[in-house]
Design a protein with these regions (language model features):
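Sec-type signal peptide cleavage vicinity
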Residues: 2-8, 17-279
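A short, hydrophobic C-terminal helix/tail in secreted or cell-surface proteins
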Residues: 278-286
Length: 286
């Protein structure tokens, strides 16, 4: 009889030990409350080389974190402003908060979203992309940039968050053609753009250097046959109308090489492989 009672007792002891071990394993993943603040290393925003006829690459105004001082960081239903401390080379940054930061509650990954710029009046909502109509000044060009990292997993042992651009970057490289020996002094604008969210339907570009002009736009599609690039030079106004729709996607860079002729514009090449065949001679608008 004693022998029969001993077996269930031993079994019960084994179950108790197993349960205790499982609880300890579960507790081992938890962290003391308020002791491990969430500090994140932010990456992304680098400028990549864009050889002629190559696929589009991620757009970046400066290719670094210079000028970004804080971001809105969302974790769960809460949104807090986090300070941005850029690295020495500005290629990455540390996101931190001194007062009332988020805290790790376990070693499990967390899901966060972050964005810049944000609306101080309502930091809880990511603002719609709305760029400047006149980007001919560097500050207005730079201030038209929007970045974010949406619903990304962040690991406890490697808390890294990669940001991307919410805008598309369009670069126009002018070359003198028949009837012109120089394109210096040209004014370049993007046309036929979407007015969604209060965006401008035309954007005056920034003369980045020499004969290179740039602008940031909201993601959109410019319809085929519509004037897309306008060049004002030597008292004449010239337009480029693509044969196919021009799809401008967030985070992409589109570089067009445009030759200015007395009879119109010729698209010499484009860094977007799927759009390289849209080149055609154009005539000035009547």
């Amino acid at each position: 009889m004693r022998h029969r009672l001993f077996i269930p007792a031993a079994t019960a002891l084994l179950f108790a030990l197993a349960a205790c071990t499982q609880d300890e394993l579960a507790d081992d993943n938890r962290l003391p409350e308020g002791e491990y603040p969430v500090v994140i290393r932010a990456t992304g925003l680098s400028v990549e080389a864009t050889p002629l006829a190559a696929h589009s690459t991620r757009a970046a105004v400066d290719g670094d974190w210079q000028g970004v001082t804080s971001v809105a960081l969302k974790m769960g239903d809460a949104v807090k402003e986090y300070t941005v401390t850029a690295s020495t080379d500005f290629k990455s940054a540390t996101l931190s908060r001194e007062n009332a930061p988020y805290y790790w509650t376990s070693r499990d990954p967390i899901t966060v979203s972050a964005w810049w710029p944000f609306d101080n009046a309502d930091i809880t909502q990511m603002p719609a992309v709305k760029v400047a109509e006149d980007q001919s000044k560097l500050a207005d060009f730079q201030n038209s940039d929007f970045i974010s990292a949406e619903n990304r997993k962040v690991e406890f042992n490697n808390p890294t968050l990669e940001f991307t651009h919410r805008t598309a970057r369009v670069t126009i490289e002018l070359k003198p053609g028949t009837g012109f020996t120089s394109v210096a002094g040209a004014t370049v604008s993007l046309m036929s753009l979407s007015a969604d969210n209060g965006n401008p339907t035309a954007i005056k570009t920034y003369n980045a250097s020499g004969n290179t002009y740039e602008a940031l736009t909201a993601p959109q599609t410019v319809a085929a046959g519509k004037p897309f690039v306008k060049v004002e030079l030597g008292g004449g106004t010239f337009y480029f109308r693509p044969q196919n729709n021009v799809v401008l996607e967030a985070g992409n860079r589109y570089t067009y090489t445009v030759k200015v002729n007395a009879t119109g514009l010729t698209l010499e090449g484009c860094t977007i492989l799927s759009l390289i065949h849209i080149s055609e001679p154009t005539r000035p608008e009547p």
